[in-house]
């Protein structure tokens, strides 16, 4: 069966799953593409619904849930090559995920700090994607919440998201803010993000990319050898991540472990977060200086009154897929 046939069959049976909480927009765009209603089953953060067939098309991140579905290590379901996937990039509905952001005020008041943090972080990402096995070990040693085997799987898959764009082309300029991919994300956000406040909804519809991103810091650090970044205005900074240490964020742990932050005059505190909402709030209210979130979450937060700006785009393509059992869709 083709992807279209599988999607239509699952949609009409009401067995397409997603977590919601801002993760659903690509799935809704995919369903719209095939003229199906945008309803989906609420999926928990295990793959048990996929396992017991209550969810026939289950949402999964390539670097996390898909690995658990396929592999037999601790926490895995051991489906191996008996599953298929539908990729949001291939379907033309990809939305960009992990970035680096801060407040506009922080960027204006601390430009050298932003450049130094970006320079060292991107150096960490460069090392991590070139040495994923070592990067996974570093993350594990920082207090991983998953097994060493899953960390290794995650590192390999995250490296693909950092080095490949939505069209499948290789990206060598880590942290690049691809205007086409960002515009597609913004356009889909305008179509599918629902905001209760009418003023916020109107603000969202009027956003341009320049309202939510600033490419100047990335451009400066990619042209630098590190010697011309200037003295950081703030030498001790913090970044809040979504979860406990794992390879989704390996670039920051590598930068910390290798001393890259020290080299640019920064002391960096990496804070384990509790999800995208707390992250945007923590950065906006000054609890932390930098955060990692999906681009759509930043857009929504700014529409709602926050004053955040993306300064680098780490993941160059969507990591979201729909996974299904081949046996369920074999003619």
Where are these regions (language model features)?
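Extracytoplasmic/secreted envelope proteins and their assembly/folding machinery
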Residues: 3-4, 24-28, 47, 63-66, ...
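Short, solvent-exposed loop/beta-turn-alpha elements that line the ligand-binding surface or hinge
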Residues: 8, 12-13, 83-93, 165-179, ...
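Structured segments of extracytoplasmic/periplasmic soluble domains
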Residues: 9, 19, 30-34, 49, ...
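Conserved C-terminal helix/tail region of periplasmic/extracytoplasmic solute-binding proteins
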Residues: 182-236
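Secondary-structure end/capping motifs
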Residues: 109-197
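Short, glycine-/small- and polar/acidic-enriched structural segments
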Residues: 1-42, 56-60, 86-87, 222, ...
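Pocket-lining segment of extracytoplasmic ligand-binding domains
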Residues: 43-145, 289, 296-297, 326-327
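Short, surface-exposed acidic
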Residues: 37-40, 78-83, 145-160, 195-209
């Amino acid at each position: 069966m083709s992807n279209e046939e599988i999607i239509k069959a699952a949609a009409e049976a009401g067995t397409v799953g997603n977590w919601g909480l801002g993760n659903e927009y690509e799935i809704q765009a995919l369903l719209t593409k095939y003229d199906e209603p945008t309803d989906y089953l609420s999926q928990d953060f295990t793959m048990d619904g996929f396992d017991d067939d209550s969810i026939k098309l289950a949402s999964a991140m390539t670097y996390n849930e898909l690995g658990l579905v396929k592999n037999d290590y601790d926490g895995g379901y051991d489906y191996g090559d008996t599953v298929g996937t539908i990729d949001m990039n291939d379907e033309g509905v990809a939305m960009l995920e992990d970035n680096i952001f801060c407040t506009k005020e922080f960027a204006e008041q601390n430009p050298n700090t932003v450049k130094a943090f970006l320079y060292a972080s991107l150096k960490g990402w460069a090392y991590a994607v070139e040495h994923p096995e070592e990067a996974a070990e570093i993350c594990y040693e920082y207090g991983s919440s998953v097994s060493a085997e899953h960390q290794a799987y995650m590192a390999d898959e995250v490296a693909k998201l950092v080095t490949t764009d939505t069209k499948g082309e290789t990206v060598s300029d880590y942290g690049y803010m691809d205007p086409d991919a960002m515009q597609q994300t913004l356009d889909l956000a305008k179509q599918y993000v629902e905001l209760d406040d009418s003023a916020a909804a109107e603000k969202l519809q009027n956003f341009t990319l320049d309202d939510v991103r600033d490419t100047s810091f990335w451009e400066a650090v990619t042209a630098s050898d590190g010697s011309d970044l200037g003295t950081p205005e703030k030498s001790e900074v913090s970044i809040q991540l979504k979860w406990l240490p794992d390879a989704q964020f390996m670039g920051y742990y590598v930068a910390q472990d290798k001393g890259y932050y020290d080299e640019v005059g920064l002391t960096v505190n990496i804070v384990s977060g509790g999800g995208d909402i707390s992250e945007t709030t923590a950065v906006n209210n000054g609890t932390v200086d930098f955060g990692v979130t999906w681009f759509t979450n930043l857009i929504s937060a700014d529409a709602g009154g926050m004053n955040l700006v993306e300064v680098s785009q780490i993941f160059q393509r969507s990591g979201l897929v729909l996974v299904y059992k081949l046996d369920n869709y074999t003619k």
